[in-house]
Regions:
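Ankyrin-repeat-protein effector appendages
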Residues: 2, 25-40, 157, 167-168, ...
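Bacterial N-terminal signal peptides that target proteins for export
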Residues: 2-11
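Bacterial N-terminal signal peptides
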Residues: 11-19
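Start-of-repeat signature of ankyrin repeats
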Residues: 34, 69, 102, 135, ...
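Ankyrin repeat A-helix N-terminal signature
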Residues: 40-45, 75-81, 108-114, 141-147, ...
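Ankyrin repeat structural motif
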Residues: 46-55, 81-89, 114-122, 147-155, ...
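Ankyrin-repeat inter-repeat connecting loop/turn
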Residues: 60-62, 95, 128, 161
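Ankyrin-repeat boundary/linker signal
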Residues: 65, 98, 131, 164-165
Length: 205
C-alpha cells in the first residue's frame, strides 16, 4: 500500500486505533466534492488527505458513494488493502452499504478470499446474510468462488447455508452439492455450527 506525504505504515496503523465515529446514513447531506476528494485520496493512498476530510466536524465521507456506486470501503476491499479497511471501519464506514450491484464489502471480500477483512467487517457489524441484487449472500459467493476459509468463517458467524438466491433459486448448500470437485466445502456446510447468532437484513443501495 502506498502512503503519501510522509506517512509510514506504522503511522497509519496508529491511526487505526482512533475511536470510531457513528456510521451515518449513506449519501445523505454529503458534500459531493468532499466525498469525491475522499475517494480519490483513498484510491491514491493519501492518508493525510483522507484523515483531513474524515476528521472534519460532522464528516460522513466514509460512507460517500461515488458516481460508480462504490464507497471507499468497496474500493479498498477489492484492492485487498487491509490497513485501509481498518482505517475506514474505525472512521464509521458502514459495511452494509451495497454498490451498484448490491454487493456489500463483505460479499466482495468473500468472493476474493479476503479473510482478514471479512472477519473485521463482521466484528464491526456487517450483516452476514445481506444479499446483493441477485439475492446472493456472502456465503453463496464464497461457495461459488471456492473459498473454503471464507465459507468456514461465515458459517461460524451464523450464515444461513439454505438461503436461496433470486437468479437460480439455489442456496449455498445447493451450490456446494453441485460442485463435486470440491467436496470439502459441502463438508464444512454440513458440519460447522454457528458460534454466534447471524445478523441479516437488507443492504443500503
Amino acid at each position: 500500500m502506498t502512503i503519501k506525504r510522509g506517512w509510514t505504515k506504522v503511522g497509519l496503523v496508529l491511526a487505526l486505533t482512533i475511536a470510531p465515529v457513528p456510521a451515518m446514513a449513506q449519501g445523505l447531506g454529503l458534500n459531493a466534492s468532499d466525498g469525491e476528494a475522499f475517494l480519490n485520496a483513498v484510491k491514491e493512498g493519501d492518508a493525510n488527505k483522507a484523515l483531513e476530510l474524515a476528521n472534519q466536524p460532522g464528516s460522513r465521507v466514509a460512507n460517500y458513494r461515488g458516481y460508480k456506486g462504490d464507497t471507499a470501503l468497496h474500493i479498498v476491499t477489492r484492492k485487498r488493502e487491509l490497513q485501509w479497511v481498518g482505517f475506514l471501519l474505525n472512521k464509521g464506514a458502514d459495511p452494509n452499504i451495497g454498490d451498484s450491484n448490491g454487493d456489500t464489502p463483505l460479499i466482495i471480500a468473500a468472493g476474493i478470499g479476503f479473510e482478514e477483512a471479512a472477519a473485521y467487517m463482521l466484528a464491526k457489524g456487517a450483516k452476514v446474510d445481506a444479499i446483493n441484487r441477485r439475492g446472493e449472500t456472502a456465503l453463496a459467493v464464497a461457495v461459488q468462488q471456492r473459498q473454503p476459509r471464507l465459507v468456514e468463517l461465515l458459517l461460524k458467524a451464523g450464515a444461513n447455508p439454505d438461503k436461496a438466491d433470486r437468479v437460480s433459486g439455489y442456496s449455498p448448500r445447493d451450490y456446494a452439492k453441485r460442485d463435486t470437485r470440491n467436496p470439502q466445502i459441502l463438508r464444512l456446510i454440513e458440519t460447522i455450527k454457528p458460534t454466534k447468532k447471524a445478523v441479516s437484513g437488507p443492504v443500503i443501495n
